[in-house]
Amino acid sequence: RKGRYNYKEASMAKTNKDAAFGLRAIGKVGQNRDNQGLGEYSISSGDTTKIFFQDAVSATAAGTIHQAAASEAFLLGSLNGVFYTDPTTSKPTFANHYEGSIAASDIKAFVADDPYERFEIQSNKTSAHAQTDVFKNFNIEVTAGNAANNVSKSELNHSTSTTGTAQLKVTGISTEIENSTIGAANLNFVVMINEHLYNAKNNGI
């Protein structure tokens, strides 16, 4: 109708905002209650790899966690902060990220680790997406995070699309107004961790 705002046409004309943020927890699948609690895990003293806020993390055979590499299995979720005793000042320290190379025996990481948690993540594809991306599996593209605020810039690696095994399973398209245009680059997907350590099908490590 003349003069009426056509949301569908406006959305199709939009571009998505290119601003990756890692894996942002948005709530559990289904209708069960989500308390958005975080699991507590250890990081090895002196681990040299920086883990940014909302980076994916995975379990190690040492009983600790570290930044998950692309295609690595045994994922636990995304990092939401750390606590440790600063080795220089001896003060208890909280941070939204793990800086790396911290010589402390009490480094604790707080992780959104529910195996049924849903996350939002941006795709690295630089051209149009498709509805058929939903229910496919993908790996993560791990990149250095934002140096200013220490937020992850990891993305869904669209080129790894498969119906076989991969780290993430797409369950839907974001409803965020700036990143929900399917026919454009940098689409935000809703995903679950497909290779979660706590999935019954996975072995121990």
Feature-to-residue mapping (PLM):
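Surface-exposed, low-hydrophobicity beta-strand/loop segments enriched in small/polar/acidic residues
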Residues: K8-I205
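Extracellular interaction modules
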Residues: R1
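Catalytic phosphate/metal-binding cores of nucleic-acid and nucleotide-processing enzymes, i.e., regions
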Residues: R4
